Amino acid sequence: MLDPRARTLLKTLIERYIADGQPVGSRTLSRYSGLELSPATIRNVMSDLEELGLVSSPHTSAGRIPTPRGYRLFVDTMLTVEAPIDAEAVARQVQNTLQAGEPQQRVVAAAASVLSNLSQFAGVVLTPRRSHVFKQIEFMRLSDKRILLIIVTPEGDVQNRMLATPRDYSPSQLTEASNYINAHFAGLSFDEVRRRLRDEIDQLRGDMTTLMHAAVTASTEVPDTEDTVLISGERNLLEVADLSSDMARLRKLFDVFDQKTGLLQLLDVSSHAQGVQIFIGGESTLVPIEEMSVVTAPYEVNGKIVGTLGVIGPTRMAYNRVIPIVDITARLLSLTLSQQ
């Protein structure tokens, strides 16, 4: 545990480093901390913080900078999110960008764009997962022995399957089959529907059972679409000296964007937690670049978490500004998708 004096000095150091990007010396800490301490006392406290792994000393400067561990303590226990931005203006911009009624993929892509524009860093969104259950199905007769199966998921995603049947079905028979499935099985997975059909087979005519089994088989044979990571504003990070000043670091950053595997894992981890999460660079393999951090939040459709969004930027970012941007965007994206 840090005593109040050490906490104040660490908080001041990190705030000044975020603002100025320069190692922070004892004179700056004396000026901004509000504490009446001698330079020698401040240096002693800094030495203690360095031994604790909360700050480090660059070789080229007498000042100190925060470590990933120092940033973690700061965002977990010292950060006050009183955004220096107009939250209502941010909400209006997000609402104007996310238009209800647009295709889901377009709305999600717009969320990545607005995150990038507001933060001036990179916006990232893990698109909604394909549902394993269905809300409604329809059969449409195309020709003799060819039927179009239309599946609507709870998220509003529409999927089509072609069915080749051993016999022809009339429109009224197709309506009867879809009405039965929607009335008895909506909200279940197709594996559950298959099990239920076995139990109820005696209640159905043989030709209807054949059609329903064909629909269930076609639905489960198609592999799930892979989770997709959408990124907007990568070029903004070229303007961030902390990330772009070193060519090896820059190459590693764009490898993260190109491969997306690490981002997918990070966003998936975030989707299992409530509210805003902050991933500090260098803390774990999830964020392999010490100078990069990610602020994320899950978003929902009708109360169910379906994806994650966030901002990728430098570890030296104004967290009190970025956190509300991510939080507001996640809430309004959830609202927009739930209204579709």
Swiss-Prot record:
UniProt keyword RNA-binding, yes or no: no
Pfam families to which the protein is assigned, alphabetical: HrcA, HrcA_DNA-bdg
Any one Gene Ontology molecular-function term assigned to this protein's record: DNA binding
Top-rank taxon, per record: Bacteria
Function recorded in the entry: Negative regulator of class I heat shock genes (grpE-dnaK-dnaJ and groELS operons). Prevents heat-shock induction of these operons.
Biological-process GO terms, alphabetical: negative regulation of DNA-templated transcription
Taxonomy of the source species: Bacteria, Pseudomonadati, Pseudomonadota, Betaproteobacteria, Burkholderiales
Gene: hrcA
Similarity-based family: Belongs to the HrcA family.
Organism for this UniProt entry: Burkholderia cenocepacia (strain ATCC BAA-245 / DSM 16553 / LMG 16656 / NCTC 13227 / J2315 / CF5610) (Burkholderia cepacia (strain J2315))
Protein name: Heat-inducible transcription repressor HrcA
Keywords: Repressor, Stress response, Transcription, Transcription regulation
InterPro entries, per the entry: GAF-like_dom_sf, HrcA, HrcA_C, WH-like_DNA-bd_sf, WH_DNA-bd_sf, WHTH_HrcA_DNA-bd, WHTH_transcript_rep_HrcA_IDD
